[in-house]
Amino acid sequence: LEGLVSVVLDELSASSRHLPVCLGLSGASTARMKEALDDTADWPINGYLIASPYYIRPSQRGLVQHFNALADHASWPIVLYNIPYRTAVNLTNETLLALAEHPNIAGMKDCCADRAQSIDFLNRRPAGFRVLTGEDAQTFDALSDGADGAILLSAHLETDTFASIRTLLRQGKRDLALTAWQSVVGLTRLLFAEPSPAPAKHWLWRQRLIDSPEVRLPMVEVSEDLATWLDAEMERRAQLLLPA
């Protein structure tokens, strides 16, 4: 918990409290997740981002009871995190609709990787329930389909571009949004060519925004081949910014 406190305090300082901060929590035990909610109840955050219990693959009925129990217990609103390729269980749309009725469940980070499921939920979700895509390479499609925004690794590197894509789509300027998207879609693929966050850390380190590309085992730093590709893409983007 001490390490988590340090990370959160750093983030709160960096955001200067102008941006909402959601604390990510995960675990396979409802009881222990409640303890984590108690431990963080007085932290100066705005909400929680909570994924499904991993590894144990509970039923949909179990997922509803799990998240409702956490929402009843939490001091801050919860954003569901549906990422079945990491947790091994998918929150179905019927389950999501049931959970969306809880007043303390505010939205979802959608990484179901099934566009048909995502569109179906967007069309059926209750008013005020926010959907944020977390699939970097599918950002343009998700925003075009009606997602409210995104939580993206790639946006750490190209924040203004990703923000402009959302703004342009909301203004009905699809062609301009597509042009902006085409300028970053290759980057989204590079950043996930090897397990994240190693590629992004390499990029930020090369830009001297962080002190080291080091990651903790079992994660490892990027391969020499990917480092070469990342460095080349960084140089290409730097050249684009030079005056003609």
Predicted feature locations:
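An acidic, carboxylate-rich microenvironment
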Residues: 32, 62, 117, 175-176, ...
